[in-house]
């Protein structure tokens, strides 16, 4: 009996240590490099996802300092930056500061479907089926974005038109769309880069063993919970997002993140 008690106590202690070390809410910046013959000078794109109006220090200082440290050429926001429950103040502060310092582009997610105008009021460019030719560091990009299908009944029509444009574009093509589960609909465009969010990293992770336990749309053991996926000729990157206090399920071994993509 004593041996069993010691064993159970040992198991409990190990589980407690495992959880404590995994309970990490320190903001990380995760970097990816994408090589392309279309690009001769590096272009740095910083991607924010799923902020859900969460707080990052006084005046969002922790988040804004991390963005500054990443030294992006442009900032993209791939949905659920606002929340449909938490008040908008933290997001308003974030967007206003970002737009003062970098070109910013925004697509809606399922929790901020009606917030495109609110983002635009801060100087952020909201994309709803739009294709924008950009020149960044003398490099030609075609930046495209889709509103969340919950908001946009024209989602399928917009996506078909954008896929057609991407197929013939000579510029480096980038698609912003909130939901990673729809990757099968995006791939016919032959995009060079697709950026999504929504999955919150699958909430619980075990690095090296489990990339995510549960995600919206995909359910248990989601295929596209977070990270980089090289699919055909497309680099698909899913941000694990920035949500903290807004989540019903705590994050485990899944710290909030910014995604920095350097195209070269």
For the regions a language model picked out, list residue spans one by one.
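Binuclear metal-dependent hydrolase catalytic cores centered on His/Asp/Glu-rich metal-binding motifs
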Residues: 116, 121-123, 128-130, 136-177, ...
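Core catalytic region of metal-dependent phosphoesterases/phosphodiesterases
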Residues: 59-135
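N-terminal active-site segment of His-dependent metallophosphoesterases
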Residues: 10-90
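Conserved beta-sheet core of the metallophosphoesterase superfamily
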Residues: 180-259
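Acidic/histidine-rich helix-loop elements
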Residues: 21, 45-61, 81-89, 114, ...
């Amino acid at each position: 009996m004593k041996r069993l008690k010691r064993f159970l106590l040992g198991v409990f202690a190990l589980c407690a240590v495992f959880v404590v070390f995994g309970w990490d809410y320190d903001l990380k910046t995760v970097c990816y490099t994408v090589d392309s013959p279309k690009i001769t000078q590096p272009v740095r794109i910083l991607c924010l996802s799923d902020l859900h109006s969460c707080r990052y220090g006084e005046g969002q200082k922790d988040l804004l300092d991390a963005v500054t440290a990443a030294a992006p050429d442009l900032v993209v926001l791939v949905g659920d930056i606002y929340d449909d429950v938490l008040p908008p103040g933290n997001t308003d502060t974030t967007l206003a500061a970002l737009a003062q310092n970098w070109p910013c582009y925004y697509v809606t997610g399922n929790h901020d479907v009606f917030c495109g105008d609110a983002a635009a009021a801060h100087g952020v460019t909201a994309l709803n089926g739009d294709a924008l030719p950009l020149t960044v560091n003398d490099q030609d990009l075609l930046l495209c974005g889709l509103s969340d299908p919950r908001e946009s009944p024209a989602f399928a029509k917009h996506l078909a038109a954008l896929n057609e444009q991407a197929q013939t574009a000579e510029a480096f093509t980038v698609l912003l769309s909130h939901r990673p589960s729809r990757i099968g609909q995006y791939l016919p465009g032959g995009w060079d880069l697709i950026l999504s969010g929504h999955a919150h990293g699958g909430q619980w992770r075990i690095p090296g063993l489990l990339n995510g336990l549960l995600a919206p749309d995909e359910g248990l053991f989601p295929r596209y919970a977070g990270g980089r996926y090289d699919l055909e000729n497309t680099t698909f990157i899913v941000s694990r997002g920035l949500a903290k206090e807004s989540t019903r399920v705590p994050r485990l071994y899944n710290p909030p993140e910014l995604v920095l993509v350097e195209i070269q």
